[in-house]
């Protein structure tokens, strides 16, 4: 997380360059049988880097996307992981509707 003291806000930065190939963002929600990622985040903003763009949103907007579009989690062992994780796969185009506007 990045803390911005001037405005008392925090930013969690995620990198998902593989999304350029898959068309999906991976939003982790559980690892080692415990809540992680989105379910543990206390950040005010999330910035997802897809290898080209920095996409700004909020945890609330991501939850809204997941719930309103009835997206279920998937379970898999990621590269470099030793155990299964649970994550939400969100189509990049779909998450685009939940990005903050006016931030470059």
Describe each model-derived feature in a short phrase.
Residues 1-3, 37, 46:
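Short secondary-structure boundary/capping segments within folded domains
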Residues 16-41:
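Mg2+/Mn2+-dependent nuclease catalytic core
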Residues 10-12, 48, 56-57:
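A structural signal for short, well-ordered beta-strand segments and their strand-loop junctions
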Residues 39-45, 76-80:
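Short C-terminal domain-edge/linker segments immediately following a structured domain
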Residues 2-21:
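Conserved catalytic cores of phosphodiester-cleaving nucleases, focusing on short active-site segments
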